[in-house]
Amino acid sequence: MRYITGGIALGSALILGSLVGAGATASATPAPAPAAQQSLYAPSALVLTVGQGDKAASAGVQRAVTLNCMPKPSGTHPDARGACDQLRAASGNFAEITKIKSGTACTKEWNPFVVTAEGVWEGQRVKYEHTFANPCEMKAGKGTVFEF
């Protein structure tokens, strides 16, 4: 009986020792952290606004939308696909997009509207502001990007 009790105690000690040893080994070498997922595309996410006034800082924002162009066009912009296509065609050059088309006839009234774009375009930080003299000029120069 004494041998049986001793054998059980020895077996228990060996099992307990192996469990503690395995626990010590597991805690000594932590599991490797999962690799951060890298995007295949440079981010393109913008907030676009239209406001009445001559400067964005003092203009009353009338409308604002979000525009995401990667990996697919989305956001609250009513024509996200068209706006993203126009930005890609202009290589993200907002000055090209807001250029008033030649041959446009508008009055010379001063009723300024300002458009802004802020965010990231193809991985590059963007902060753009353009003031149109009046709604006629804005309609002639805003393109799809600021049409909302």
From Swiss-Prot:
Residues 1-38 form the signal peptide. GO terms for molecular function: serine-type endopeptidase inhibitor activity. It holds the Pfam family SSI. It is found in: Secreted. Keywords: Disulfide bond, Protease inhibitor, Secreted, Serine protease inhibitor, Signal. The keyword Zinc does not apply. Disulfide bonds join 69-84, 106-136. The keyword DNA-binding does not apply. Inhibits transglutaminase-activating metalloprotease. Belongs to the protease inhibitor I16 (SSI) family. This is Transglutaminase-activating metalloprotease inhibitor. It comes from Streptomyces mobaraensis (Streptoverticillium mobaraense). The lineage of its organism: Bacteria, Bacillati, Actinomycetota, Actinomycetes, Kitasatosporales.
